[in-house]
């Protein structure tokens, strides 16, 4: 009779443990889904900011070209750099799906680090070029 109680208690403990493991797996998968959704939202926001930045740079380049008409060699070089930056930004938009496929095996932190490194690598030179272009134009006007 004691043996039956031992078997029954062992069975209850095993089933409780199995339920807790199953619940842990479900909560882990739910957490992964939430992290993936938040990462997609972040990518969407980043894509929107990049598109706004691209359109602003394109408008700025067109405005400079219309306002000044003829360009000096220095202005031409600055405009070429701005156009190269715009092309780099365009390539970022198209490579997002490819990079998403490449990074499926990485964990979420590694993915976030990859995108922030890419953004820093592109935004630094963009801001430098824009500030140099605006500074040069202000000097010419002033």
From Swiss-Prot:
It holds the Pfam family Bombinin. The keyword Ribosomal protein does not apply. Belongs to the bombinin family. This is Maximins y/Hw. Transmembrane segments: none annotated. The modification Isoleucine amide is found at residue 141. Residues 1-18 form the signal peptide. InterPro entries: Bombinin. Residues 19-43, 72-121 form a propeptide. One of its GO terms (biological process) is defense response to fungus. The modification Phenylalanine amide is found at residue 68. Keywords: Amidation, Amphibian defense peptide, Antibiotic, Antimicrobial, Cleavage on pair of basic residues, Cytolysis, Fungicide, Hemolysis, Secreted, Signal. It is found in: Secreted. Expressed by the skin glands. It comes from Bombina maxima. Maximin-y shows antimicrobial activity against bacteria and against the fungus C.albicans. It has little hemolytic activity. GO terms for cellular component: extracellular region. It comes from the Eukaryota.
């Amino acid at each position: 009779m004691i043996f039956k109680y031992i078997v029954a208690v062992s069975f209850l403990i095993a089933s409780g443990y199995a339920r807790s493991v199953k619940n842990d797996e479900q909560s882990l998968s739910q957490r992964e889904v939430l992290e993936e959704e938040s990462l997609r939202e972040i990518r969407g926001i980043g894509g929107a900011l990049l598109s706004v930045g691209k359109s602003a740079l394109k408008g700025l380049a067109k405005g400079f070209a219309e306002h000044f008409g003829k360009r000096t060699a220095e202005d031409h070089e600055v405009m070429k750099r701005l156009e190269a930056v715009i092309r780099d930004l365009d390539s970022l938009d198209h490579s997002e799906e490819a990079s998403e496929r490449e990074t499926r095996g990485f964990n979420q932190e590694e993915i976030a680090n990859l995108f922030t490194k890419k953004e820093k690598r592109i935004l630094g030179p963009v801001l430098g070029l824009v500030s140099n272009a605006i500074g040069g134009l202000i000097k010419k006007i002033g």
